[in-house]
């Protein structure tokens, strides 16, 4: 299957002049200046701060202090394009895109113009947002929270969309994948409550997080088989989970686990200089997810 996906990507790229051009993003767009660092921040902000509105001001300050060039956001509940634009202005981003206004929207902001916006709602629980900025195609990811079968279909749809991009495209996948990496399996295997927790969760929510009573690692494996690089894993010194934080200690949230990732195509991963989960006292009380960050240099077009 993964070989087919990679072949399809080449076929789509070659077919651009023959009628697939409407699906391809325009070439020659402005990129970051050579030598400049390019920083991405990805953050699931838990129901758009509707549950804990007092955390919003701290969140805006945190993002501003991080000084990202591009931001991938999940769970922008109750947001409008104007509301996202106001947030983006707080961290000096004049450009922003909201996927939708209902349900659990994703959003994207940038210090540079955003082009090639592609919104896909069909086939995805929360939708898929694709944008281009700084010479990079960025997918804002938020996969299904409670069903491994649906997540697998979403991954396949994501890879089909990826196949429509030019062969040499630099691509990032950033967001809340709601699933597990084989790189973290040794940590999860040592947890006495990981499987029992998901059994409780699936029973409570009528979900399907477990496949045959076990964690399902196939989703991210398919991305890596297609050539994507897990940047956090590549740069980290040890495991850090991105969920849960200390914000919901009164709830049964299960053991810490990594749900938030940034994946890059090899041509972009080669310029990655840093990638990390931002776990500290501040981020522990802003949302139920910790943010993740990646930095690239040189960021050439």
Where are these predicted regions, by residue range?
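N-terminal, active-site-proximal structural segment of metallo-dependent hydrolase catalytic domains
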Residues: 6-9, 14-18, 24, 29-87, ...
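Structured beta-strand-rich core segments of catalytic domains in phosphoester-bond hydrolases
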Residues: 73-153
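Active-site beta-strand/loop signature of hydrolases that rely on acidic residues for catalysis
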Residues: 38-45, 59-81, 138, 158-188, ...
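Conserved beta strand-loop-helix elements of the APE1-like EEP
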Residues: 103-116, 223-224, 254-270
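Metal-dependent phosphoesterases centered on the DNase I-like endonuclease/exonuclease/phosphatase
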Residues: 156-255, 259
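Stable alpha-helical elements in mature extracytoplasmic
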Residues: 55, 59, 80, 84, ...
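Active-site beta-strand termini and strand-to-loop segments that position acidic
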Residues: 109-111, 129-134, 265-266, 287, ...
